[in-house]
Amino acid sequence: MTGRRTVSLHVGPVGLCGVDEAGRGPLAGPVVAAAVMLDPKRPIKGLRDSKKLTPAARERLADEIRARALAWCVAEASVAEIDRLNILHATMLAMQRAVAGMSHAPDDVWVDGDRCPEWTWRSQAVVQGDDKVAAIAAASILAKTVRDELMRGLHEAYPLYGFAQHMGYATAAHLAALKANGACPHHRRSFAPVRLLLDQTSLF
């Protein structure tokens, strides 16, 4: 089934860079973006939207992408930048950093979603691109695996919040931990559940 899905993904023009992000929705941690230029001479089987892959498959494919891609780069925007800029602009900043950090300059940049950052590269937005375009799928896999590893690191530093289980998303367990322990330095103060909690605690 994976092989059939891979064949259906659009390869795109030569010199195409695919871009995707991970971590727009969570209450904690950075937003991570990845940019990938695939090598048509070294195809990678099994590429698809990272959310539709098992963790083991994501890790295996991430290793293949790093080994076989013409170029790739992963970048992030910090929690402080998210709170200062808002999550949309911070995501665009992370994407800009990822493309700018690649060792090869792309001819075209295709971005997952409905908008592109303001930059000089020729680009287009592709809605659900991580399930349509191979390079965007590869970028989604790198962004997801890198961010998950970052959140596991935060779990070691702040085990009370369970970051390794929910990766910062607003699960019932995470919200309960926030209520019991307050916010840590890696929580996004601009996000409503965190902000409301801080507002409530400041009243007492």
UniProtKB/Swiss-Prot annotation:
It holds the Pfam family RNase_HII. Keywords: Cytoplasm, Endonuclease, Hydrolase, Manganese, Metal-binding, Nuclease. Manganese or magnesium. Binds 1 divalent metal ion per monomer in the absence of substrate. May bind a second metal ion after substrate binding. Its cofactor is Mn(2+); Mg(2+). InterPro entries: RNase_HII, RNase_HII/HIII, RNase_HII/HIII_dom, RNaseH-like_sf, RNaseH_sf. A divalent metal cation binds at D20, E21, D112. It is found in: Cytoplasm. GO terms for molecular function: manganese ion binding; RNA binding; RNA-DNA hybrid ribonuclease activity. PANTHER family: RIBONUCLEASE H2 SUBUNIT A (PTHR10954), RIBONUCLEASE HII (PTHR10954:SF18). This is Ribonuclease HII. It comes from Thiobacillus denitrificans (strain ATCC 25259 / T1).
